[in-house]
Amino acid sequence: MAFVPFQAPQGSTIAVGMSGGVDSSVTAYLLKKQGYDVFGIFMKNWEETFSSGYCSAAEDLEDARDVCQTLDIPLHTVNFVQQYHDRVFQLFLDEYRAGRTPNPDVLCNREIKFAELALYAQQLGADFLATGHYAQRLQSDNHEAALFKGVDAQKDQSYFLHQITPAQLNKAIFPLGGLQKKQVRAIARERGLTTFDKKDSTGICFIGERPFRAFLQQYLPAQKGLMKTPNGEIVGEHMGLMYYTIGQRQGLGIGGIAGASEEPWYVLEKDLSNNVLIVGQGDHPLLYHRVLIAGQLSWLNEAPIAGRFYHAKTRYRQSDQKCRVDYAADGRLQLTFEQLQRAITLGQYAVIYDGERCLGGGVIEARMQGKQDVSS
């Protein structure tokens, strides 16, 4: 099947999700330059009163206004605070409470940006919603929309978009997918957009620059417990299982163990029933798994074919990992990797790729040490 770049029909009205950053700024500029009827929308998803600390929403809105004024396009604002709290943030808390590590940015794209924001854009007369994501929307021979990686491998964001629905993708445009980040900044500078040198946002949007532990403590009471080795030896005390992720090295505070080597300590497992953090040193075997099970599956077009080999990512910016796709009796996805995978984390997403094309994926719910041969 052949795929070609998608071009919105001339005369289309396109809404741009304006974040106040350089990517959405250049997205709006490029679309207007191409002759489309463009307007911006700035959405507010978080209420500053929900938590103490600094929130950049006010500054971001001012930056979005400056850019839209420079480009001479209208800017609308909309409040999705309640929707975000109910459909993204509450699940984020539930997952951490259950000892898993969620990715709220994936949920925000599916539940808010390409659902609530897209609907609001449509009500304002938009034919399409454009965002500053580094991903590509291509079109197949039979005119189906397909999601491909952005050409900038360091910035590709198809991982965060894999849970959107085919209907949502059909109304989405990603003008930056064929550009490098440095090209985007250069365009912004040449056009005189005030966001050309604005720092990229990092981390979870509603946490900002605050320490993660301090933020989470406002919502989930911490229960301290023991750190133990797989053999049951007590080596320290943890501050609450929710604060730790599989493979974590920093912040464990383990030292001076008699008879222990100088190798660093890592989080291996979480024993939820006993409130125990299992830790080990160096490249411990419990850090590595060959098989994972994923549920809550979402496919952009057709599902991967059982028994075939694809590539997968189990976290953002991971290099593609070759794996065989199978399905468990209950319909969940089973991936068997060619190479052992380090620190597969429950609650994160396993995303499947066929070459550069993103097929979709699901939430990692289990992992196994499986040793079976999966050579193709």
From Swiss-Prot:
Q: Which UniProt keywords apply?
A: ATP-binding, Cytoplasm, Disulfide bond, Nucleotide-binding, RNA-binding, Transferase, tRNA processing, tRNA-binding
Give compartment(s): Cytoplasm
Reactions accelerated catalytically: S-sulfanyl-L-cysteinyl-[protein] + uridine(34) in tRNA + AH2 + ATP = 2-thiouridine(34) in tRNA + L-cysteinyl-[protein] + A + AMP + diphosphate + H(+)
Q: Which GO terms describe its cellular component?
A: cytoplasm
Looking at the keywords, is Transferase present? yes
Gene Ontology BP terms? tRNA wobble position uridine thiolation
Q: Where is this site: Interaction with tRNA?
A: H133, Q348
Q: What InterPro entries does this protein map onto?
A: MnmA-like, MnmA-like_C, MnmA-like_central, MnmA-like_central_sf, Rossmann-like_a/b/a_fold
Instruction: List GO molecular-function terms, semicolon-separated.
Output: ATP binding; tRNA binding; tRNA-uridine 2-sulfurtransferase activity
**Stretches for region Interaction with target base in tRNA:** 103-105
* Positions of ATP binding: G17, M18, S19, G20, G21, V22, D23, S24, M43, G132
Note the SS bond partners. C108-C205
- Locate the active site: C108, C205
The record's family statement is: Belongs to the MnmA/TRMU family.
Stored NCBIfam families: PRK00143.1, trmU
Can you say what this protein is called?
tRNA-specific 2-thiouridylase MnmA
